[in-house]
Amino acid sequence: MAKTIQAIRGMNDCSPTESLLWQWVEEKVRSVLQTYGYSEVRMPIVESTPLFARAIGEVTDVVSKEMYTFWDNDEQLTLRPEGTAGCVRAAIEHGWIYNNEQRLWYMGPMFRHERPQKGRYRQFHQVGVEVFGIANPEIDAELILLTARLWKQLGIFDHVTLQLNSIGSLESRQNYRSALVEFLQQHMDLLSEEEKERLVKNPLRILDTKNQVLQEVLNDAPKLLDYLDQESREHFSQLCDLLDAVGIQYEINPKLVRGLDYYNKTVFEWVTSALGAQGTVCGGGRYDGLVEQLGGHATCSVGFAMGLERLVLLVQEVNKQIVLPSAVDIYVVYFGEKTTLPAFQLAEKIRTELPHLRTMTHCGGGNFKKQFKRADKVGAKFALVIGETEVKTQQVVVKDLLGGAEQLSLALTDVVIYLKQAITQ
């Protein structure tokens, strides 16, 4: 027997049963985004490597350690580690955002070479939302309201907490950076080698260190909110007022900075304690300078991303009320001489007239007992039975596989009407 080949570490398969839950979550996402009037876009998973170096920042962990990068002839390419940079690139390239507001969303796989763990994989799936051309805090609030509505639809709202911060303008961060470095230099003995490197290249990233001793010390560090410019301060205050007015509770987390360099002003995360250490479910904020940084006209922008793997895990963990649809509504069973064609004709008639129902025709032969076992295995709600007698009498036997109702015989012409009523009920 030939040696089997396994999936690559950190790259996962999704079974038919698991896919039902994924489809349920994805449909909730699409429904909420459509409710708010957002438009779907699709971008390639491979982009030019310099796009991410310029957008995310060369000293970030994502660019310096985690990207899947390769050469194609003389061009360096990367499997996208996140979606914002590619969306901005597409918006600039195709003129989607010139003198125009856009509210966009996308869904698809991303890739990062990091240590796989629960809810974090090397290939993962993100939903991203990007808004271009709106500067005021109302749109920041709308994105937070949109995510809150989604959490309610998914049945997880009571298990997530909103954390907010403002990281201000570039000048604000530069002033704060100096104060933070001066503070941390008094505690060099607590810094790991990696954190000492960050102190030089990107000291704000030390604020979300996993080092608990250092976290305690950082409670006494200067607060970024105290270094905000007036415009950023007013923007953040108005955002908080809006959230208060609509009853969205939040915590101001002065250590929240996000892991990518393009953010400014508002940053936010929805976090949960239900998934252990990997607590962030969704994160985002403003990135008003990124479009210009990537060669476009200056365009204010804001967005967020959520990891679907982590979202599905959270739904599984806390929402026990989900009733997922079965993979099959109707299973067509047939046995005997000249039953195959009528069975296939009936199945096609149902698919044409009741396209919302999932109809499966048995293939592969076998007696009625074997076919009914298969119908049970796929979770079908009804079996439609055609034998030699039914062919002669132009009838079909309908058997309720879940509800326990007595089976009945119907004329072929009445089957669609019966199923429409029975499955709707």
Curated annotation (Swiss-Prot):
Annotated TM spans: none
Statement: the UniProt record of this protein carries the keyword Transcription regulation: no
One record GO biological process: histidyl-tRNA aminoacylation
PROSITE patterns: AA_TRNA_LIGASE_II
Catalytic reaction list: tRNA(His) + L-histidine + ATP = L-histidyl-tRNA(His) + AMP + diphosphate + H(+)
Pfam family, one: tRNA-synt_His
Listed EC numbers: 6.1.1.21
Any one cellular-component term (Gene Ontology): cytoplasm
Subcellular location field: Cytoplasm
A GO MF label: ATP binding
Keywords: Aminoacyl-tRNA synthetase, ATP-binding, Cytoplasm, Ligase, Nucleotide-binding, Protein biosynthesis
Subunit structure: Homodimer.
HAMAP family: His_tRNA_synth
Family label: Belongs to the class-II aminoacyl-tRNA synthetase family.
Descriptive protein name: Histidine--tRNA ligase
Source organism of this protein record: Histophilus somni (strain 2336)
Record lineage: Bacteria, Pseudomonadati, Pseudomonadota, Gammaproteobacteria, Pasteurellales
